[in-house]
């Protein structure tokens, strides 16, 4: 069983039986974090990049002068990468995943490396800093799209603020968010969010409905287990307002096997 399937198995198990594995977090701490993560509407409209279901994401229409996409976590489709290659002339796409043998698509702009992204570099892992240093000398802006089954937290915590600031747009699928109710996990997860919020702001959230038992209910709050977050670097934001309703007109369920999970309103009101 690979990491992706193993993570999904335990997530479903814990959510089904509402298993909490440590001391619960103070509800006020949790509400404060969620308040920081509420998405905003900016001067850049959102567009859908990629497929109609899993693998497609909403990002700001702010793509000029972006040189590279770094996309760790490879699935059997690469519609996001394919779409961006069509939209951004000369874009180079760097993919990485130790659990697969090759990129799902062949294109002159695609470069695949058989490694996981993590907080150390060795024969199986590399850090975001080492990966970028190895692949590009460009000083222009980059895009990061990351779906790495829970490793996103240690990667963000380990990555220097200066390096995160290289990415104009960041799309991350955050896993195990139901564990925000647990004190130990909350410290780890919130540290990652606080790191990225120094340089970027949330412009979109979409719960992933591929997890069978979708969320944990905690003191009146609903915490979807897996959610896609889109961030835009602060210097690209000239004006912003609150978002009044979800889902976005371009949102689509990640799987057709079950109904989409609508973002609970306290995540944006």
Short names for language-model regions:
Residues 95-103:
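Short, polar loop motifs at secondary-structure junctions
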Residues 166-177:
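Conserved beta-strand signature within the Rossmann-like core of class I S-adenosyl-L-methionine
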Residues 144-151:
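Switch II (G3) loop of P-loop NTPases
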Residues 3-63, 67-70, 77, 113-114, ...:
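Rossmann-like AdoMet/SAM-dependent catalytic core
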Residues 76-88:
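Conserved SAM-binding loop of SAM-dependent methyltransferases across substrates and taxa
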Residues 115-119, 147:
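Conserved acidic residues
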């Amino acid at each position: 069983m690979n990491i992706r399937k193993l993570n999904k198995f335990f997530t479903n198990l814990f959510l089904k039986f509402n298993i909490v594995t440590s001391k619960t977090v103070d509800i006020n701490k949790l509400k404060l974090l969620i308040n920081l993560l509420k998405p905003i509407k900016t001067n850049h409209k959102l567009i859908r990049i990629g497929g109609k279901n899993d693998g497609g994401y909403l990002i700001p229409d702010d793509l000029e002068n972006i040189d590279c996409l770094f996309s760790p976590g490879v699935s059997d489709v690469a519609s996001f990468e394919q779409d961006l290659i069509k939209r951004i002339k000369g874009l180079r796409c760097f993919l990485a995943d130790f659990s697969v043998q090759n990129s799902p698509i062949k294109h002159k702009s695609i470069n695949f490396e058989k490694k996981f992204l993590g907080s150390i570099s060795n024969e199986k892992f590399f850090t975001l800093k080492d990966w970028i240093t190895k692949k590009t000398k460009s000083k222009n802006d980059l895009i990061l799209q990351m779906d790495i089954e829970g490793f996103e937290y240690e990667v963000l915590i380990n990555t220097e603020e200066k390096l995160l600031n290289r990415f104009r747009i960041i799309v991350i699928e955050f896993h195990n968010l139901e564990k925000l109710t647990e004190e130990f996990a909350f410290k780890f997860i919130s540290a990652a969010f606080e790191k990225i919020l120094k340089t970027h702001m949330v412009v979109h959230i979409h719960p992933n409905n591929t997890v069978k038992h979708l969320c944990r209910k905690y003191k009146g709050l609903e915490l979807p287990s897996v959610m896609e977050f889109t961030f835009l670097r602060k210097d690209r934001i000239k004006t912003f307002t609150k978002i009044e309703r979800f889902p976005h007109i371009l949102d689509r369920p990640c799987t057709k096997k079950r109904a989409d999970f609508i973002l609970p309103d306290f995540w944006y009101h």
